[in-house]
């Protein structure tokens, strides 16, 4: 079913920039956090793809995910450098994974970030909610500057979903962008629940992107529905939206995320851009990032007819009028 989705769009596959691969002991704690009811969502969060690493990689490949992030993040000092070392090994044995890395506000952060970039890291993750830190911390100023200069994207969980942190919301990260306007930042989860404010940031800063992780799924729509009034803006920002899924830490089948996006009725060109072309441009031959491996098709493959990015056909109701079929939050055993 997943392969039928992207083949129907005339794509060579998917690029999912927001998946998680971590050392087994760390991932086990993440899974226990979600399944133990500590995520603050007031409902069950079963892990749909609780499988060994090799099986998770094989599943993404079977889905037709040609490139994927391998995001990981620390929750305390003296952890990021070790995570980066593990991530480098994962990237070496998983050529279709985007070599990912992370950081924490601590002495030496600039040094190990420079080392990771030099070793080939092409995507970073910052989790302001879990890390509980201020992104404007002076120990991170050189880190943000380095990422901006190298044009290496960083996925930032800066929205206040599923629960607010001391430094979530648009305010703190806006301070970083004001100081480093050339930073290539990807706002995780479309910035839920502050969708409009983070779309504003994308309008002000040309290198700010947003990923779709969990957005428009039945699960997130119950917690933080996307306002229908913002759909035209989402359509207009189509060249800045990237597919993300949160695989494997999702409580529904992978296909549900794709069907939720299709259910917005923003047109086939918008879906092609979001599900493949935007990330191929950002990380592939045209992105200046240096990861020149074949992506299985050019970025400009938008030949199928249908509405343009601005052809917003969503009518009435909230964006929570989710027309995606299947994939209820409890259907976690279906790929």
Mark where each language-model region is.
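Conserved, mostly hydrophobic/aromatic
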Residues: 18, 87, 147, 189, ...
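Histidine-centered divalent metal-coordination motifs
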Residues: 18-24, 157, 189
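Catalytic pocket-lining loop regions of alpha/beta-barrel enzymes
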Residues: 122-123, 133-242
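Active-site gating/metal-coordination segments in enzymes
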Residues: 66-67, 74-168, 206-209, 217, ...
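Short aromatic-enriched loop/helix-cap "lid" or pocket-rim segments at secondary-structure transitions
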Residues: 25-30, 81-82, 112-113, 167-168, ...
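Short, well-ordered alpha-helical microsegments
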Residues: 84, 108-110, 173, 194-198, ...
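Mid-to-C-terminal alpha-helical segments outside catalytic/metal-binding sites
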Residues: 1-17, 24-67, 237-240, 251-306, ...
């Amino acid at each position: 079913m997943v392969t039928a989705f992207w083949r129907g769009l005339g794509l060579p596959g998917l690029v999912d920039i927001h998946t998680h691969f971590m050392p087994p002991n760390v991932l086990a704690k993440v899974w226990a956090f979600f399944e133990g009811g500590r995520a603050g969502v007031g409902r069950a969060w079963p892990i749909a793809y609780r499988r060994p690493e090799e099986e998770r990689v094989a599943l993404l490949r079977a889905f037709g995910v040609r490139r994927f992030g391998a995001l990981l993040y620390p929750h305390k000092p003296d952890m990021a450098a070790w995570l980066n070392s593990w991530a480098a090994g994962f990237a070496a044995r998983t050529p279709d994974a985007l070599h990912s890395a992370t950081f924490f506000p601590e002495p030496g952060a600039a040094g190990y970030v420079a080392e990771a970039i030099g070793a080939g890291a092409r995507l970073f993750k910052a989790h302001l909610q879990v890390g509980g830190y201020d992104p404007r911390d002076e120990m991170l100023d050189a880190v943000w500057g380095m990422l901006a200069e190298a044009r290496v994207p960083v996925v930032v969980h800066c929205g206040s979903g599923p629960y607010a942190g001391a430094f979530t919301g648009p305010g703190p990260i806006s301070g970083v962008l004001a100081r480093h306007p050339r930073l290539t930042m990807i706002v995780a989860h479309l910035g839920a629940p502050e969708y409009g404010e983070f779309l504003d940031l994308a309008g002000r800063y040309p290198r700010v992107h947003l990923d779709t992780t969990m957005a428009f799924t039945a699960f997130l729509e119950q917690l933080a529905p996307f306002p229908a009034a913002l759909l035209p803006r989402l359509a207009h920002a189509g060249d800045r939206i990237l597919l993300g899924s949160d695989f494997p830490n999702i409580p529904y089948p992978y296909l549900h995320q794709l069907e939720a996006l299709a259910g917005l009725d923003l047109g086939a060109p918008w879906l092609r851009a979001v599900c493949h072309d935007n990330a191929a441009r950002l990380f592939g031959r045209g992105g200046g990032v240096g990861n020149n491996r074949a992506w299985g098709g050019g970025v400009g493959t938008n030949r199928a007819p249908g509405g343009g990015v601005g052809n917003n056909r969503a009518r009435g109701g909230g964006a929570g009028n989710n027309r995606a079929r299947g994939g209820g939050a409890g259907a976690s055993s279906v790929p």
